[in-house]
């Protein structure tokens, strides 16, 4: 799908098709941010690294290809909104904001320490580029509904992206918000469900089954895409389709169900719920980086084969 976007810093003048070069650029950016996430957890002593790594591809492509944002003017009225509903994954989100220029790297080096602006949960009153404070799970989609309705009332058009976790979808408030998004025909809402199948207490299926997520959101009135959450091409095509739906006057919000792995890319973390939260010393960080070297090579090889 090739859309003539009229959005953001990258569009239309700097917009490029999703070709091999662009795909590789995003792969390398995601690799850099995964490493940044782990290093930040070392600086801060600990962090919710598992869910941050499972969602990093989503945040990478949004912030580096799609979102209409300006680090020099972070409060511009028509900016796209991003809601990290799984707010505990700030250790992954903060590096994304630093990389885009919303704050200096020095802030990461004091992550979650006394006096730091950024902690385990982001505070929108302290951190440039953060649209809302999150952490109490289940409320991100409700906030996005409010943002979308406010834009409609004020005559301002922007996209509202929400990143939730599958464990978070245990919360009933998500489904009240889903009903509202469909009822008010908020086609500028795109919900990403990070379906990594793990939560703090164990496997999601053992705690509270949420599948089939695609059929559930479809029943709630959403356009639904189910993708490999670690495949940039699949993410790109789903996001482009969601934006096109809105630009073409569609009347449904979009849900993108991302099948992912907790701790993606780090062999001793991957698919292990015990890495929902954890700490790394220098030895573990070195092992993680070595694993990420192999992971990047595998992903770039896939690009060479499929692009």
Predicted regions, residues:
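Glycine-rich beta-alpha junction loops
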Residues: 88-89, 93, 196-197, 231, ...
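Cofactor-binding active-site loop characterized by glycine-rich and histidine/acidic residues
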Residues: 40-41, 52-183
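N-terminal capping segment at the start of a domain
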Residues: 30-46, 194-196
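Thiamine diphosphate
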Residues: 129, 133-136, 141-246
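Short acidic, glycine/serine/threonine-rich loops at helix termini
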Residues: 94-96, 123, 173-175, 201-205, ...
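Short, Lys/Arg-enriched N-terminal segments with co-localized hydrophobic residues
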Residues: 1-10
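Generic beta-sheet signal
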Residues: 80-82, 158-162, 189, 250-258
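Glycine/aspartate-rich loop-and-adjacent alpha/beta segment that forms the canonical ThDP
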Residues: 232-307
